[in-house]
C-alpha cells in the first residue's frame, strides 16, 4: 500500500527517522510473555468498516487445473545447482520440489484509527489464506494470520508478534518444504547503513505499533527469514506495499523479459554527460570535471553495493519474492468488484487461478497485464539465486 502511515497514498517521502517516539494508536495489546508457538487460530472476526461483500474477490474464470504443474520438462531441476553470474565458485543452491510440509504467515494491517488508514489489507489476508488452502494444499492449522481487527492480542500485527511469527515460519524447515509469507500494509524507505542498496535506502514495513516500537527493515527480514533456510527449502514471499521491490534483499532481480537486471549505468552516464556538456557550454571547466567525477563515483558506488549484496544476500535455499512495486514506487489500495483490496494481492491470485501452469516469466507478465490497465506500479520478481524464468514453472 502506498507510502507509510500519515504520508498519503501518493507520497514519496522516506521513512528515515519516522515512527519513533509516538504513542501507539488504538487496538494495540502488549505481547504475552513466554509465548512459545502458534496454535491453530480461529477465522479472524469480521470487523470490516467498509462492508466488503461476502464471497471474496471476483476472479476471472479458472483453468480447472487444481493439481498444478505436472509436465516434467518444466519441473524445478533436482540436486545442487551452481550460481554462476560472478558468484564465488563454491556457491550452490537447490530448488525446492515443494512436496514437503507447508507453513504460511500472512499479515494485513489497515491501521484502524491512525493517519493513513488503509482499507484492503485485512481482506488480502482472508483471500490469500483461502486461496492457499483451496489450490496449494495449505492447512489452516499451519497458518498464522496477523491482522489488526483480531481480538486475540497474539494475533495483532505488532512488531514483536511479527518478528516472533517470522521466526516460527522458518523454524525446522527441511528440503522440499514450502513456506509462504504475505505482507499487505504500509511500506517505506530508510537510509541504508550497511551499503547493500544501490539507491542508498533500505526498504521497511510498518507494524501496527510502529510509532511506539519502530519499523522492520529489509536487512532484518533477510536475517530472520532467509539466512536460516537450508538448501532445498522454498520461501515464497509477496509484499503488497510501497517501495517493496527488494524488500527481502534478494540479489537476483528479473524483468518481464526474464533478463537479470543490472544497475542502469547507461542512464546514469547520460545524466553525467549532460551535466558535463552544459558546464562546457558555459565555459565552466570545473563543472565538467565535477559532472564526470560524480558519474564515475556513482557508478563505482553502485557496483560496490551490488557486489556486497551478491556476496552476503545469496542463499542455498529457494527464495522467491513477488513485490507490488519497484523500490521507488508506491502500491495501490484498490477497490475491485466493490471490495477493498491490494492490487498486487488480487493480481497474483487472479493470474494463478486463470492458469497455474506458468513459468516465472509468464506469471510476472500475467500479473503486470492485470495491473497495467489501471495502475502505474510495476511488480517485480526477485530471487536468492539465478532463476530459469523461461523454462521452469512456478510452484509453491
Swiss-Prot record:
Belongs to the peptidase C14B family. The active site is at residues 186, 242. GO terms for molecular function: cysteine-type endopeptidase activity. GO terms for biological process: apoptotic process; proteolysis. Its EC number is 3.4.22.-. The lineage of its organism: Eukaryota, Fungi, Dikarya, Ascomycota, Pezizomycotina. It comes from the Eukaryota. Residues 47-62 have a biased composition (Low complexity). Pfam families: Peptidase_C14. This is Metacaspase-1. Residues 1-86 are annotated as: Disordered. GO terms for cellular component: cytoplasm.
